[in-house]
Amino acid sequence: MAPTFDVIGLVVADMAASLAFYRRLGLDLPPEADNEPHVDLALPSGLRLAWDTVATIQSFEPDWTPPQGGPRIALAFRCDSPAEVDRTYAELTEAGYEGHRKPWDAFWGQRYALVRDPDGNGVDLFASLSES
């Protein structure tokens, strides 16, 4: 049997701040998770999204340090409509999260916007333009 892709893991500096951001994107994360060193959430697609604090990673990899420079990954969230892309981008940036690129109509047929989570990871918001 071949390995199965199952989890996308994020290493975070502040668990509560990171989970607050992802709750705004509709993820159902319990409030008590804010104080945990590891959080694991099953997504409707069957994949899991996991968060670990830097201290958790360093507990088994003592010399590990967070990567420097730009984001190394991007998580993309599909929105129901182009208007929802605009609305979600506005809500996140008004709440103080970094907007990396304001919504635009991409040549590949989607309304697209780019934000950053509290750890600087890229988070894409998109919707098909044909659904507008």
Where are these regions (language model features)?
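Short, small/polar residue-rich loop motifs at catalytic or cofactor-binding pockets
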Residues: 107-110
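Residue-level "edge-of-site" marker
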Residues: 35, 105
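Glycine-rich, proline-tolerant flexible connector loops at the mouths of alpha/beta enzymes
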Residues: 38-40
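Glyoxalase I/VOC metalloenzyme domain signal
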Residues: 1-6, 11-33, 43-98, 116-132
